[in-house]
Structure formats: C-alpha cells, structure tokens
C-alpha cells in the first residue's frame, strides 16, 4: 500500500491535494515553468501475514529522498543533509512519534484486514498453451514456446521436460508481464532440435493449483503428420457418406409410409 501524506496529516487528504495539483491547468505537459514536487510515501511491509509488520514513510523532494521514518527504529532519520533539520524537529515531537508507532496497528494491520480477501488470498489459475515458434521440418533448430497467461498472484514456476527429463539448458523467459487487469503472463521458451517421437512437456506450478499443470507437444515427422491428416480426412469423408446414406434411407422410409394401401377404398 502506498499513499501520500505529510507528518501528522492524513494519507487520503494529502493524496487528494496531490491529485488536484497534478490535474490543474498548471500541470499540463506544455507548461515550461519550473515545478517542485514534494512527496511522502507510506509503505507497509508484511511478513507471514501480519506476524511481522513494519511501517516505512519516505519523504521525497524532486525525486530525491531526504528523510524517512522507520517503525523498527521508532524515529525519523535523515537520508541527506537536506532532511537533517526536519528529522531532528520531528523526533522532538513526542506526540507525533507516538502516532507513528501506533500506525503499525491502526494503519498497516487494519488495512491488511480490509484488502486481504481480494489481494493476498486472490487466486486465478493460468491458461497454458505450447507451440513451436516456426513451422519447419524436424531435426532443424526451433524454439518451443510455453505461453502461460492470466494468472494471479505473480509467483509461478515453469519447467520444460523432454521425454520425461528436465531441460535446463536453452531455456529463456520473458519474465513476468502485467496484463493490466490484476493478472500476469509469461513466455518460457526452449531452444531445441526436435526429433521424431520426442515428447516435450511444459510443467507449470502456481498457488492457484493443488498440483502441477502439464501440457505436451509431440514431435512428428512429415510422413507421420501426412498419415494422421489422411486418417482424419478419411474419417470425415466416411462421416459424410454415412450422413448422406442415412438421409436418403429415412427420406425413402417417410415416402413409403405416406402411401395409402390399395383395396381399402369403398
């Protein structure tokens, strides 16, 4: 959680003021007048839930941090000489220090409980696909791509296997990419020379799943692919003939049932 505030002030109030200033006509990109930006960033750090919590408040002037408050130390520290007078003054304000020390509970732990259900506990299972980067004959250098998309949180482990043996050499990754909707994606690629009969497996482990998710890609020769396509084509053609035959049969049956038997006329 990050917010803006000044010593003794409210995070929300300071954030509102900052947004108002930045959205005013004076903050337009075409304005060439010199601007000076004062920031205060509140950071709540958590370890094992709320078992270990510390609060860090950083004071920044024109992108340079000059002072900070660390709840582990319970006092303000000067980062540069510019911040020394401020740190000394704030440390002399006992009521301010007491409020800062209490914020570990009143601000950090409290807000953890508010957002935990849709942040810390949020789980979205990844979607995994495997494909070669280029369509070319076997026994040529290729790049197998394992696309892992739409998962949350960002902690994930992706491994490549060839015929059941893990491949570590030739594995490259794009790293985590944010999708902008609180999910992530990554591409993990394996440089290899596929040979007929080999089976490549991308294995994904993620907190949203109880067990690893595996997706396989099999290397097939051109003749094997041709046979498979021929088989599929023959199967589809057979279905067409079967459908046509059934259609003709049922149409003929309907025609016969519509004929009135002879000898029943009066």
UniProtKB/Swiss-Prot annotation:
Residues 30-227 are extracellular. Changing residue 106 to N: In allele DRB4*01:04. It is found in: Cell membrane; Endoplasmic reticulum membrane; Golgi apparatus, trans-Golgi network membrane; Endosome membrane. It is a single-pass type I membrane protein. Keywords: Adaptive immunity, Cell membrane, Disulfide bond, Endoplasmic reticulum, Endosome, Glycoprotein, Golgi apparatus, Immunity, Isopeptide bond, Lysosome, Membrane, MHC II, Signal, Transmembrane, Transmembrane helix, Ubl conjugation. Its main location: membrane. GO terms for cellular component: clathrin-coated endocytic vesicle membrane; endocytic vesicle membrane; ER to Golgi transport vesicle membrane; Golgi membrane; late endosome membrane; lumenal side of endoplasmic reticulum membrane; lysosomal membrane; MHC class II protein complex. The chain crosses the membrane at residues 228-250. Residues 126-216 form the Ig-like C1-type domain. Residues 30-124 are annotated as: Beta-1. This is HLA class II histocompatibility antigen, DR beta 4 chain. It comes from Homo sapiens.
């Amino acid at each position: 959680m990050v917010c803006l505030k000044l010593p003794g002030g409210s995070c929300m109030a300071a954030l509102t003021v900052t947004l108002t200033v930045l959205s005013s006509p004076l903050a337009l990109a075409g304005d060439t007048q010199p601007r000076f930006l004062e920031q205060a960033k509140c950071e709540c750090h958590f370890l094992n839930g709320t078992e270990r919590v510390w609060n860090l408040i950083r004071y920044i002037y024109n992108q340079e941090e000059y002072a900070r408050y660390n709840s582990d130390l319970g006092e303000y520290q000067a980062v540069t000489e510019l911040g020394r007078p401020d740190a000394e003054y704030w440390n002399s304000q006992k009521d301010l220090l007491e409020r800062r020390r209490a914020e570990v509970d009143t601000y950090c732990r409290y807000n953890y409980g508010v957002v935990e259900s849709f942040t810390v506990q949020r789980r979205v299972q990844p979607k995994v696909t495997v494909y070669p980067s280029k369509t070319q004959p076997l026994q040529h250098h290729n790049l197998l791509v394992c696309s892992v998309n739409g998962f949350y949180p960002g902690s994930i482990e992706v491994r490549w296997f060839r015929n059941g043996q893990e491949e570590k050499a030739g594995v490259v990754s794009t790293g985590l990419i944010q999708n902008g909707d609180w999910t992530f994606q990554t591409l993990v690629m394996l440089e290899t020379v596929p040979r007929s009969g080999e089976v490549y497996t991308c294995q994904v482990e993620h907190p949203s799943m109880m067990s690893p998710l595996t997706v396989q890609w099999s290397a097939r020769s051109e003749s094997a692919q041709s046979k498979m396509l021929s088989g599929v084509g023959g199967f589809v053609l057979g279905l067409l003939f079967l459908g046509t035959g059934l259609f003709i049969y049922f149409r003929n049956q309907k025609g016969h049932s519509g004929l009135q038997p002879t000898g029943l006329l009066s």
